[in-house]
């Protein structure tokens, strides 16, 4: 069995996240894609939408796709969870032959700062989703995603044109109410 893990804040989920999910299902030889909304990104101190709201958005977008599992694992920990901990958790459950860990190209600059990175890189095959013309080393597998958007831009500019229709109304309502406070 081969699994892929795609963790993120999904604050909010947008078309690039959706493209990554669909590209992973199409291009990776996997039996399961585990999407993990974080409780809190280990490199951040706060979130815009609470974890349960982000989980609901992820479920609305992807839970009905074949081979996809939306995991509550990190949210249930009520703390920032390093990727290594999530990888070990799912290795214990599924005993996979291969674990792909999907990251955005913007994470490459911080990758060696990740908790126990040297251990993590022995356990997973990194798959990097292209972003903003960031060069991806040739030794890493690449997912070609040509959607230029970030969750930060959506939140800060209330620019919802790249939010998938399945969650658009709820995302707009949430962030407009949050910014009105």
From Swiss-Prot:
Highest taxon in the source lineage: Bacteria
Pfam family, one: CTP_transf_like
Single biological process term from Gene Ontology: NAD biosynthetic process
EC number: 2.7.7.18
Record's catalysed reaction(s): nicotinate beta-D-ribonucleotide + ATP + H(+) = deamido-NAD(+) + diphosphate
Pathway(s) the chain acts in: Cofactor biosynthesis; NAD(+) biosynthesis; deamido-NAD(+) from nicotinate D-ribonucleotide: step 1/1
UniProt keyword Zinc-finger, yes or no: no
Principal EC category: transferase
UniProt xrefs under HAMAP family: NaMN_adenylyltr (MF_00244)
Record family assignment: Belongs to the NadD family.
Name recorded for this polypeptide: Probable nicotinate-nucleotide adenylyltransferase
UniProt source species: Campylobacter fetus subsp. fetus (strain 82-40)
Gene: nadD
